[in-house]
């Protein structure tokens, strides 16, 4: 069942009142398409026989403790089962198109302590698999498979995930750990319609959380209150897991790309960067908004926000089948450079600044990444974007550092390919049902700028250091949405308010 909610704050932040309403969820009666995914993997493997062996995540205790680690299912296992509980395994017999889910047997005394896991009958009803068996029978099945005359290849992700047959029988299996991972990555990069629905739902919940923060931001006093509201809204909607650690960085903290302390006072700050997205049924969302803490932008923050908003708007408009991500990233960098030149933060001849790649001092990360079972999801065989000649993939958004020299190399390669009519063979072209983030940002990190650029003759003269002092208090501005590539363009899956709507939501919260 899908859940809507009203989150009402009482006495500023003393209590939360949840009004929950249930209505029909169109995906609630639809099984996760495990067999569809398994067949996609086999097509990418290009084989007509063999066994795919994928263990799920076992229950693991914290170091030197009897308490379990927070459970997170292995994503490759989940992709071909949809099963989200501990100590399972999946096998797929390619020749017979047979997908088997192996589950742990739960003794009655275990139910007393920890509760039950789904039974074999329940799993058969719940999951799109051909058979459900207990893991106590798995080693016998594998020994029988290995005992065949010339047994087919068993495909595993990693050598450390080789199956344990017991009785020293492992050597009888013909194991391959080189082909399955890239095949599954190629299968995962283009989402099934069910997967799109999961990412959409995660975005809807996360967007509601961002909206609720905006409604309350004028009453909040500390970054941790932002984190608490986001978690409360997501949990109330049925999502207990965040896809990544919440970022709530105010003032100068917003210039740290992966700020995580979330405990600073909001007082006296111009902006707060909020980067937060929950998971729904193991599928991620990824959303960033930058909010003015007074309800109105300061002139400096307004100027930077306008540049970043233009970067995002124009880049989203370029998303569609056949688009090259590197070119979209370069467009974002160009818009950012023009904006900073217009403000005077960057100075000099436009051609010289572009050739040096100095704008990367302020926009130092990749434009975006795939989203799916992982927030920084797999890209398949080809990188979403790359700095050719440097072996640097830019598939992981703000986890992918883009230096000025890398940006300059990307620009040079792009220009040379345009001149000779070259293709994009080394990087990925967007395809329908890919989901990517578009997350440009401009940051004023004093330590980074002064530590690397002030003394570098290749860049120092292109930055007005006196004027820059006036912008350090802005911190950073980033705006991020999840974008679905469609047959004829794109769809923005993120419905969190931004632009003028965001300001309206913030200021209505005064009442």
Swiss-Prot record:
Mn(2+) 1 binds at residues 286, 439, 480. Binds 2 manganese ions per subunit. It catalyses: Release of any N-terminal amino acid, including proline, that is linked to proline, even from a dipeptide or tripeptide. Its EC number is 3.4.11.9. SUPFAM superfamilies: Creatinase/aminopeptidase (SSF55920), Creatinase/prolidase N-terminal domain (SSF53092). It comes from the Eukaryota. Keywords: Aminopeptidase, Hydrolase, Manganese, Metal-binding, Metalloprotease, Protease. Pfam families: AMP_N, Peptidase_M24. Catalyzes the removal of a penultimate prolyl residue from the N-termini of peptides. Belongs to the peptidase M24B family. This is Probable Xaa-Pro aminopeptidase MAA_08947. It comes from Metarhizium robertsii (strain ARSEF 23 / ATCC MYA-3075) (Metarhizium anisopliae (strain ARSEF 23)).
């Amino acid at each position: 069942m899908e859940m809507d909610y009203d989150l009402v704050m009482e006495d500023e932040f003393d209590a939360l009142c949840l009004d929950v309403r249930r209505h029909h969820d169109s995906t609630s009666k639809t099984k996760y398409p495990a067999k569809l995914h398994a067949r996609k993997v086999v097509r990418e493997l290009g084989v007509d026989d063999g066994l795919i062996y994928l263990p799920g995540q076992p229950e693991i205790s914290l170091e030197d403790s009897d308490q379990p680690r927070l459970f997170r299912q292995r994503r490759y296992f989940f992709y071909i089962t949809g099963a989200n509980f501990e100590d399972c395994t999946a096998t797929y017999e390619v020749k017979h198109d047979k997908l088997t889910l192996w589950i742990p047997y739960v003794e009655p005394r275990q139910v007393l302590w920890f509760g039950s896991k789904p039974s074999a009958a329940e799993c058969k009803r719940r999951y799109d698999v051909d058979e459900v068996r207990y893991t106590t029978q798995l080693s016998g099945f594998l020994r029988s498979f290995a005992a065949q005359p010339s047994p087919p290849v068993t495909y595993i992700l990693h050598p450390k995930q080789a199956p344990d047959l017991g009785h020293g029988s492992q050597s009888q299996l013909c194991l391959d750990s080189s082909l399955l991972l890239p095949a599954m990555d190629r299968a995962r990069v283009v989402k099934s319609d069910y997967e799109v629905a999961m990412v959409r739902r995660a975005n809807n919940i996360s967007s509601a959380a961002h909206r609720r923060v905006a409604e309350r931001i004028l009453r909040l006093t500390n970054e941790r209150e932002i984190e608490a509201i986001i978690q409360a809204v997501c949990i109330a909607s049925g999502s207990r897991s965040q896809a990544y650690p919440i970022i709530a960085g105010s003032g100068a903290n917003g210039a740290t790309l992966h700020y995580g302390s979330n405990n600073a006072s909001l007082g006296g700050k111009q902006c707060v960067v909020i980067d937060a997205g929950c998971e729904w049924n193991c599928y991620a969302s990824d959303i960033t908004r930058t909010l003015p803490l007074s309800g109105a932008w300061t002139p400096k923050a307004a100027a930077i926000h306008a540049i970043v908003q233009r970067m995002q708007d124009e880049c989203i408009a370029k998303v569609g089948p056949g688009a090259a991500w590197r070119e979209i990233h370069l467009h974002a960098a160009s818009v950012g450079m023009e904006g900073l030149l217009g403000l005077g933060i960057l100075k000099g001849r436009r051609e010289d600044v572009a050739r040096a790649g100095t704008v990367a001092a302020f926009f130092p990360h990749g434009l975006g990444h795939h989203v799916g079972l992982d927030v920084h999801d797999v890209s398949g065989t080809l990188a979403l974007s790359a700095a050719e000649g440097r072996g640097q993939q830019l598939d992981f958004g703000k986890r992918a550092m883009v230096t000025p020299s890398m940006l300059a190399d990307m620009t040079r390669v792009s220009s040379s390919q345009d001149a000779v009519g070259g293709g994009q063979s080394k990087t990925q072209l967007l395809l329908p049902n890919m989901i990517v983030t578009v997350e440009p940002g401009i940051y004023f990190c004093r330590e980074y700028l002064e530590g690397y650029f002030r003394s570098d003759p290749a860049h120092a003269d292109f930055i007005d250091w006196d004027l820059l002092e006036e912008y350090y208090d802005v911190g950073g501005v980033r705006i991020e949405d999840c974008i679905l590539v469609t047959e004829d363009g794109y769809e923005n899956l993120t419905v969190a308010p931004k632009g003028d709507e965001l300001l309206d939501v913030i200021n209505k919260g005064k009442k």
